[in-house]
Swiss-Prot record:
Quaternary structure note: F-type ATPases have 2 components, F(1) - the catalytic core - and F(0) - the membrane proton channel. F(1) has five subunits: alpha(3), beta(3), gamma(1), delta(1), epsilon(1). F(0) has three main subunits: a(1), b(2) and c(10-14). The alpha and beta chains form an alternating ring which encloses part of the gamma chain. F(1) is attached to F(0) by a central stalk formed by the gamma and epsilon chains, while a peripheral stalk is formed by the delta and b chains.
PROSITE patterns: ATPASE_DELTA
GO cellular component: plasma membrane; proton-transporting ATP synthase complex
Topology class, membrane: Peripheral membrane protein
UniProt organism field: Methylocella silvestris (strain DSM 15510 / CIP 108128 / LMG 27833 / NCIMB 13906 / BL2)
SUPFAM superfamilies: N-terminal domain of the delta subunit of the F1F0-ATP synthase
InterPro entries named in the record: ATP_synth_OSCP/delta_N_sf (IPR026015), ATPase_OSCP/d_CS (IPR020781), ATPase_OSCP/dsu (IPR000711)
Keyword Membrane among record annotations: yes
Name listed for the protein in its UniProt record: ATP synthase subunit delta
Length: 188
């Protein structure tokens, strides 16, 4: 089993590790994961919020005040997550909060034996194929379960593209044809 230190790195990884350790200590990892998902959704939905967390114009005090009001309205006030986000704001690190959330999710997924996969296919998969693919990916990842999102993209013509964590396998017909085309150009 990989150590937490090797799963994430950098400044965002250090903050995520600290939050994950605190959440474990408080028995609140699921609650923190849910709260972070809520905050991440808020970031995704609001361009103003994204601009706010990235802007160097606001002081740490202004960011903390605004964040308190926002978290209060979202029902996250007084939680481990709100304490963490306020600390991040006070340290002027809100610009990296999306990376911190991503890294926390990596640590959380690893702790609960979950791997995430993104699959692209040319045509919709049957339920039995989805189940078989999940089982195969779980075996490859060495995890107890796999959460898989399937995207249908007819432009790949056939085959499959799988991204599992940081690994990607492109076994699409489109890629194979492009590879053959490139080799033919080299020869002729």
């Amino acid at each position: 089993m990989a150590k937490q230190e090797t799963l994430v790195s950098g400044m965002a990884g250090r903050y995520a590790q600290a939050l994950f350790a605190l959440a474990q200590e408080r028995g609140a990892t699921e609650g923190v994961a849910t709260d972070l998902a809520t905050f991440a959704a808020m970031l995704d939905e609001s361009e103003d919020l994204r601009n706010f967390v990235r802007s160097p114009v606001f002081s740490a005090e202004q960011q903390t005040k605004a964040l308190d009001a926002l978290l209060d309205r979202a029902g996250l006030s007084g939680t481990t997550t709100s304490q963490f986000l306020n600390l991040v704001a006070s340290k002027r690190r809100l610009f990296a909060v999306a990376d911190m959330i991503r890294d926390f999710n990596i640590l959380h997924d690893h702790a609960v034996g979950l791997s995430r996969a993104a699959v692209t296919v040319a045509e919709p998969l049957k339920d039995e194929h989805v189940a078989a693919l999940k089982d195969a990916l779980a075996a490859v990842a060495g995890s107890q379960r796999v959460e898989m999102s399937v995207k249908v993209d007819p432009s790949i013509i056939g085959g499959i593209i799988v991204q599992l964590g940081s690994r990607m396998v492109d076994n699409s017909l489109k890629t194979k044809l492009n590879s053959i085309r490139a080799r033919m150009k080299e020869v002729g």
